[in-house]
Amino acid sequence: MCFVGIIRFHVHILRIIPGGERFFLLLVLSANAFGAGLDRYSQLVVSDSGANPRNGVRVTYLGTNSYQFEFKNHALLVDPYFSRVDLLSVALGAHIQPNSSRIADSMRHVAPTVDAILVTHGHFDHLLDVPIVMSKTHARLIASRTSIDLAKRAGASSGDAVIAGDVRRIGPWKIRVLAASHDRLFGKVPFDQTASQHSGPPQHAADWVCGEPLAFLIEINGQHIYIDSGGTAAPLPPPVHVDLAIMGMALPDSRARLTAALERLKPRYFLPSHQDDFFLPLSEGFQFGPLTDFPRVQSDCAQENHGRLILLDYFRPWTLPAHQAPNPKIQRPGKRSNSDGK
């Protein structure tokens, strides 16, 4: 087939594919090279060593925008997603379902009992696996009304629907629910509905609609962790100082708001999230997604000088250092103290 014929074929396919899946087919056509891994940025990757104390808040990256936070014998999950549905299945609107084998492999890194699962929005890469993870960990689900509805139709037994401004106290965790937004992909938020058009179980990627995007401010052990999955400059995070800011950086909208978001949060540590190619199995290791731009993120962070930029690799826990205020009796004049530790 000649080049013109290939273009005509692609245009024909785009015309007959429903609008939601069309976003992802465009992504397939635009992703002409695999992203690099973390080797190039090894100096930014943090993890616990055998000698490090683990009595603080431990953070484990589980891929996509999935995280586990642990403190003593308590655990909290955010957006657990391990099935990693392939891109072509999503682009062509094929039936998708949780991958039991991949979920089982990843659950080896998850605490056996989890206090709660927080979900930022209803897309499949945040919510698809949640009903199974709930059943395995006996966790309580905290999410938007739309996400709760989707999860229940997919098999979840219950859920706590929340809106911005709500506060939940679960064990040692204090969770504040914040307003958020979702990035646009090719000018539009994918699957941008607040209620599904179907009443049965979600079958296709387009059935997992966005709903009401949320962010969370988690208070634990005297430390504050902010987490979202990305978004636009409206709304920005609240003007609060946090110890760790985890912000989605998958798409241009998120990167455009980064400077303003860091200025408001003033984090000690900044962890860009949702940067990996979540259509690849976790077993293939971290690869940057085709639409990410980590060099820009790194450059913007250097210019703003708000907190230490870090990266996490899959399943390698890192303990958030305690904030150590400088001791005026010990600090020498003219010397700057380091309050962050390693």
Positions of PLM-derived features:
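Short, basic, low-complexity termini and linkers enriched in Ser/Thr/Gly/Pro
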Residues: R8, I13-P18, A325-K342
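Binuclear metal-ion centers of metallo-dependent hydrolases, dominated by the metallo-beta-lactamase
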Residues: R140, K152-V167, E263, R268-I330
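Active-site neighborhood of phospho(di)ester-bond hydrolases with catalytic His/Asp-centered motifs
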Residues: V78-D79, V114-G122, I142-S144, Y226-G230, ...
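Beta-strand-turn-beta hairpins that frame and shape the catalytic cleft
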Residues: N52-V57, F71-L76, V167-R176, E219-I225
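Active-site HxH/HxHxD metal-binding segment of metal-dependent hydrolases
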Residues: L87, D105-R168, W173-K188
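Active-site-proximal loop/helix segments of hydrolase catalytic cores
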Residues: H198-R264
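Bacterial N-terminal signal peptides
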Residues: G20-N32
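Pre-active-site segment of Zn-dependent metallo-hydrolases
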Residues: V45-G50, N73-V119, H123, P131-I132, ...
